[in-house]
């Protein structure tokens, strides 16, 4: 189940019970009183359709190393277990969680520095919409696509 209060229009989410051909959904509208989410469903065959679902039926789209690599994130060359995304004027690192496969600890690095001692560490994130919220907060014009 997803927390409807954390969602924003444009966030990427997924259904709790996926069916064949379904990939993910893009939030188009929210009604927090009724708990309904209007979303665009995206299918593997490039098809799309509008749908309305209860927030109980939806869940966050999970982050993964493969998804991050497909969006341009890469491991550092010095062998550290950190995925880096370089954006001007900051660098963002994502350290995989020791407890969960889908969770990451974001670190914010000034300029092009990749030393952990220069970083600002943040709370663990688990989904694409949480990472997108951080990127938007830092005013980076980057969209994470599944």
Regions found by a protein language model. Give the residues of each.
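Short intrinsically disordered terminal tails
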Residues: 1-2, 140-146
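Short coil-to-beta transition motif at edge beta-strands of beta-rich domains
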Residues: 2-18, 24
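Short beta-strand-centered aromatic/proline hotspots
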Residues: 19-37
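SH3/SH3-like beta-barrel fold
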Residues: 35-45
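Short linear proline/tyrosine/threonine-rich motifs used for host-factor recruitment
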Residues: 39, 49-51, 85
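Intrinsically disordered, low-complexity, charged/polar segments
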Residues: 46-74, 118-142
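Amphipathic, interaction-prone secondary-structure segments
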Residues: 72-102
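Intrinsically disordered, low-complexity regulatory segments enriched in Ser/Thr/Pro
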Residues: 90-125
């Amino acid at each position: 189940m997803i927390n409807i209060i954390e969602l924003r229009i444009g966030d990427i989410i997924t259904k709790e019970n996926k069916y064949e051909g379904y990939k993910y959904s893009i939030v188009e509208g929210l009604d927090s009183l009724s708990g309904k989410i209007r979303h665009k469903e995206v299918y593997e065959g490039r098809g799309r359709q509008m749908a309305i679902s209860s927030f109980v039926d939806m869940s966050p789209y999970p982050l993964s190393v493969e998804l991050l690599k497909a969006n341009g994130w890469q491991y550092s060359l010095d062998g550290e277990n950190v995925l880096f995304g370089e954006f001007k004027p900051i660098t963002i690192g994502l350290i995989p969680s020791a407890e969960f496969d889908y969770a990451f600890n974001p670190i914010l690095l000034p300029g092009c520095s990749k030393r952990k001692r220069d970083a600002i560490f943040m709370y663990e994130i688990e989904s694409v919409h949480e990472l997108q919220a951080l990127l938007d907060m830092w005013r980076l014009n980057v969209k994470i696509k599944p």
